């Protein structure tokens, strides 16, 4: 895998390289990573870059985004992750296939024990990874329902023998099972002054030195705040929506 496989994000060469290296190792042995940072710092953009790189080098990408309104729905997050490969559940032992279908309301009967569902999820990913490396990319893990967080953590701690990569982004200050699992971490800090100026030039064009200094000081290296502080960001609804969606 070449370092150039990932698109460039301003001021994020170190983080992109770390993700690229992780995916490179993941084609041979499982890897897991927690991406941690403040709102607007760029976690979602980094996951997007990881997704592009993973697909470019042959991974099957399974992605999900935690949604606060679904945090009380058991296994909603896990369903997001596994839905594209649920047909492969037919390759599992019947007890595991039934466990997953029951968890997702696709089969009658009581919901199985969480441990059984977690084992079934691992076996399903292993079956898929036997044909093609798998990258599980989850944004806003802190908003996943508790059951899905625990299963995701279970998966991440059992990837080593298989071509499975698990990367989850967590907002700073939101403890949970995934963050507490002791997995390797990538802490995303604010961008430096040079990158901050480049972001401003990209979003706002030419600014007066005093305006540039003010925005840079107020943003404190946060890319979303940096972009939001530019006049062009506020004047362009398309720019505003796009930036808020892609940079967290």
Role assignments for model-derived ranges:
Residues 1-248:
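Key residue(s) within conserved catalytic/signature motifs
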């Amino acid at each position: 895998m070449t370092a150039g496989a990932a698109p460039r994000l301003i001021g994020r060469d170190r983080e992109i390289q770390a993700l690229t290296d992780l995916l490179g190792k993941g084609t041979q042995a499982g890897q897991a990573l927690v991406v941690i940072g403040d709102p607007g710092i760029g976690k979602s953009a980094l996951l997007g870059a990881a997704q592009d790189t993973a697909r470019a080098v042959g991974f099957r990408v399974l992605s999900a985004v935690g949604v606060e309104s679904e945090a009380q729905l058991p296994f909603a997050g896990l369903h997001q992750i596994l839905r594209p490969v649920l047909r492969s559940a037919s390759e599992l032992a019947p007890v595991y296939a039934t466990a997953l279908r029951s968890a997702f309301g696709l089969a009658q009967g009581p919901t199985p024990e969480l441990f059984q569902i977690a084992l079934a999820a691992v076996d399903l990913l292993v079956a898929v990874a036997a044909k093609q490396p798998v990258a599980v990319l989850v944004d806003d893990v802190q908003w996943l329902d508790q059951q899905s967080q625990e299963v995701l953590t279970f998966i991440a701690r059992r990837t080593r023998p298989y071509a499975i990569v698990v990367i989850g982004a967590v907002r700073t200050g939101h403890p949970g099972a995934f963050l507490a699992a002791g997995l390797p971490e990538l802490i995303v800090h604010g961008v430096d002054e040079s990158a901050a100026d480049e972001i401003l030039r990209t979003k706002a064009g030419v600014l007066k030195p005093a305006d540039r200094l003010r925005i840079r000081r107020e943003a404190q290296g946060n890319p979303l705040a940096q972009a939001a502080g530019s006049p062009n960001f506020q004047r362009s609804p398309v720019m505003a929506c796009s930036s808020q969606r892609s940079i967290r």
